A protein has these predicted regions:
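Patatin-like phospholipase
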Residues: 1-40, 50-345
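Gly/Ala-rich beta-loop-alpha elbow adjacent to hydrolase catalytic centers
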Residues: 41, 45
Length: 345
């Protein structure tokens, strides 16, 4: 069956993004994946959008995705501690005013504490950034992980492996100083490194270090997770690619569809420490944005709604093939089959 969709919008959601792999498998099986020409995403949706932009098979996309070691993403120490830093840690532990807690703070947590004050985030995103660079490089002829491949490069098939044309990629970031979303794309930010834009888009406030960035034509600012302000950009393409009346029927053909996460509110999460508090704030922001979706029958009809069960979006203790990975993968596949079956009616 031929579907009307040309554009795909993906929601953010941390490790829930694994479910997009199951979604891709079903879209490919139905012939819908080949029709997608443009992708947009925030946070985890930006990561998946980048992978989908390569126009690989669902299996090859999963292979790239599975090379990510989720346990390394919340990275406490990016570089070896210098002697000066170790001395500062010992001096911190010796502070009588902080007793008894100061002596219990490890060197790793001390580094995180400094990062929180200096870079506005507990964890480093260096590992993730270098993983992104390696994945991007693998899709180019010269294949150099040290090179900064830009959005302009993504639009030049002659540079790509096998001269493969990529899908148009759009990434959502949040300019905290300007209080608004910023769009990264070949049209708006041709000279920006794609890996840097995706890193910005997944930088959950206070959980990961914020990114200092100068968006073209704007003052330098502090950038954080695009999902903070626009977690599910389902309407991103609507002005340029509006729905059209379906011939002979009293309904319209949508050019854009999307995938989002349906997380149960359930019982309150623990909030016993800073990390749990940050996780709760992030998930509260995502839930607040869900109100827009809940009051839009149109968006509901064109969305793959993936049930996440009791798996937390920041549950990084997950790896390919384990129980939670399989649950998310199957949740994405099941939701996609259900969505496509409704499209065929």
């Amino acid at each position: 069956m031929k579907y009307s969709f040309e554009n795909l919008a993906l929601s953010g959601g941390g490790v829930w993004g694994i479910a997009y792999l199951g979604m891709l498998e079903e879209l490919e099986r139905a012939g819908a994946l080949a029709q997608i020409q443009r992708v947009v995403g925030a946070s985890a949706g930006a990561i998946s959008s980048m992978l989908i932009s390569f126009r690989l098979s669902a299996a090859k996309t999963q292979e790239l995705s599975d090379s990510l070691d989720y346990s390394k993403i919340p990275q406490k120490v990016a570089d070896p501690a210098t002697p000066q830093l170790q001395a500062a840690h010992k001096a911190f532990q010796a502070q009588q005013a902080l007793e008894p807690h100061a002596k219990n703070i490890s060197l790793e947590d001390f580094i995180c504490l400094l990062r929180l004050f200096n870079k506005k985030g507990w964890y480093s995103s260096d590992y993730f950034y270098h993983w992104l660079k390696g994945v991007v490089a693998s899709q180019f002829k010269d294949g150099r992980p040290d090179k900064k491949y830009t959005f302009a490069d993504f639009a030049k098939p002659a540079l790509h492996k096998n001269d493969q044309p990529f899908r148009q990629l759009h990434v959502i970031g949040c300019d905290a100083n300007a209080h608004q979303a910023r769009i990264f794309s070949a049209e708006l930010t041709p000279d920006v490194e794609v890996a840097e834009a995706v890193r910005i888009s997944m930088s959950i406030p206070f959980f990961f270090e914020a990114q200092n960035f100068s968006y073209p034509g704007q003052p330098a600012g502090v950038f954080v997770d695009g999902g903070t302000i626009w977690n599910y950009p389902i309407n991103f393409f609507d002005d340029k690619y509006p729905a059209k009346p379906k011939q002979g029927e009293d309904k319209e053909e949508e050019k854009t569809f999307g995938a989002r996460f349906d997380a149960p509110l359930g019982k309150p999460s623990p909030d016993a420490n800073l990390i749990q508090h940050i996780q709760n704030i992030a998930q509260s922001a995502w839930q607040a944005q869900n109100l827009n979706y809940q009051y839009s029958p149109r968006d509901q009809a064109r969305s793959i709604s993936i049930k996440t069960g009791d798996i937390s979006a920041t549950e990084f203790d997950i790896s390919p093939g384990d129980d939670n990975y399989q649950r998310l993968f199957q949740a994405g596949a099941t939701a996609t089959r259900d969505f496509l079956s409704h499209c065929e009616r």
